[in-house]
Amino acid sequence: MKAYKGFNKDMTCNPNGNVFQFEEGKTYEEAEAKLCESGFHACEAPLDVLRYYAPHGSVYHEVELDGVSDERKEDSKVCARKIRIGARISILNL
């Protein structure tokens, strides 16, 4: 599934207070995907990433997700077991 992910400026995320470092072009995998608890999170609707990563101090990438959980909340945020970090996109291209 194609989706969009925000990161801190240094390509890190801080899920549950733990720093996770990402790199463009790499693939990452976890054992399970549970929305807001485990796995890799991204948004199907590009502008939804702004709810989680404000434009100042953030970067955005297209990502490819596999093993996506069926769980959903109030927006297009999804969670997957596997994520491939694609190209960086500007805020104007979201």
Model regions and ranges:
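Short, glycine-biased loop/turn motifs at secondary-structure junctions and
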Residues: 1-94
